[in-house]
UniProtKB/Swiss-Prot annotation:
Matches recorded under Pfam families: Semialdhyde_dh (PF01118), Semialdhyde_dhC_1 (PF22698)
Name recorded for this polypeptide: N-acetyl-gamma-glutamyl-phosphate reductase
Keyword line: Amino-acid biosynthesis, Arginine biosynthesis, Cytoplasm, NADP, Oxidoreductase
Gene Ontology terms: cellular component: cytoplasm
Gene name as annotated: argC
CDD domains: AGPR_1_C (cd23934), AGPR_1_N (cd17895)
Length: 329
């Protein structure tokens, strides 16, 4: 039995990972934590999320006593916290010898110089960063199994990279174009005017400046054009990706490239069939559909995930189970 502490458990992602870990044989929850200043401290998780009324745990403030208890009792920590908060907490718990699964962007880039531009802070822990592994579960399992500092990928990068990485050897120098739509939960639980019921509408945001663009490009090894959109639905991501493939590429070459997922139970790839967001909501799956035009060598790929599941919590659970050598269900 491995004990997992969850910090930031009051948010959508934190609550989701709590539910998943609570249901896992072989894993137990050491405690649920929020910041000392949180208005949710002391509340039961079920008070915030009646859906989780079967989870009889309260949200404790993360003070010094709580941190000491985590170090003594837990095998791993999940951080569902803000980037700057995770920056410091991840380094501290890692240095105490715990496995850290960080859902923020604080450890996703290897290069220190990317953090001031894309996250607005200077990274203070270069040695911890050097030890961090990018937790794209289907692609980095060996490193995830041996590292104690796992940077769980962002939601858009998970959808995009799962679709694109098998094609890396078939791409030309023409930048892939990624247009992706996310549900409102991707913006977090905090009340904001543009995500309120009467205001939310399909709209692009972060155009030519979203921090997930360099994350995708870094992991793919090629620059991309990425445009995220806010959709007027609760959860899910649908990415539509247009790429140019090398001259002479055939549909059979594409089929062969995607055979890398033949033994990946959570990824399904189909030719000429395209997923809907509803196909993946509340699941840990990634559904990919593609169609190829041999006359122009252009390929259109769609990738659908649940942003709170495969895009965050269930991928973190995958990483936890890989790290602790448990088989995926």
């Amino acid at each position: 039995m491995k004990n997992i502490a969850i910090i930031g458990a009051s948010g959508y992602t934190g609550a989701q990972i709590t539910s998943l870990i609570n249901a896992e044989m072989g894993l137990s929850i050491q405690g649920l934590y929020v910041s000392e200043n949180s208005l949710d401290k002391g509340k039961a998780l079920a008070e915030l999320y009646p859906t989780y009324s079967h989870i009889h745990l309260c949200l404790s403030p993360l003070n010094d006593d709580a941190k000491a208890a985590i170090v003594e009792q837990a095998d791993a920590v999940v951080l569902a916290t803000d980037h700057v908060v995770s920056l410091h907490l991840a380094a501290w718990f890692y240095q105490q010898g715990l496995a850290v699964f960080d859902l923020s962007g604080a450890y996703r880039f290897e290069a220190l110089d990317k953090y001031p531009k894309w996250y607005g802070f200077t990274h203070e822990y270069p040695q911890v960063l050097a030890d961090a592994v990018y937790g794209l579960a289907e692609w980095n399992a060996e490193k995830i199994a041996t590292s104690k500092m796992i940077a769980v990928p962002g939601c858009y990068p998970t959808a995009s990279l799962t679709a694109l990485k098998p094609l890396a050897d078939l791409l030309t120098d023409v930048m892939p174009v990624i247009n992706a739509v996310s549900g409102v939960t991707g913006a977090g639980r905090k009340a904001q005017l543009h995500t309120s019921f009467c205001e939310v509408s399909l709209t692009p945001y972060g155009v030519l400046g979203h921090r997930h663009q360099p994350e995708i490009a870094t992991q793919l090894g090629q620059e991309v054009i990425f445009t995220p959109h806010l959709g007027n639905f609760k959860r899910g991501i649908l990415a539509t990706i247009t790429v140019q493939l090398a001259q002479g590429t055939t549909a059979k070459d594409i089929e062969a490239a995607y055979q890398c997922y033949d033994n990946a139970p959570l990824v399904t790839v189909k030719q000429n069939q395209f997923p809907k967001v509803d196909d993946v909501v509340q699941t840990p799956n990634c559904l990919i559909g593609w169609k190829f035009d041999p006359e122009t060598n252009y390929l259109v790929v769609t990738s659908a995930i649940d942003n709170l599941m495969k895009g965050a919590a269930s991928q973190a659970l995958q990483c936890i189970k890989i790290h602790f050598n448990e088989l995926l269900k």
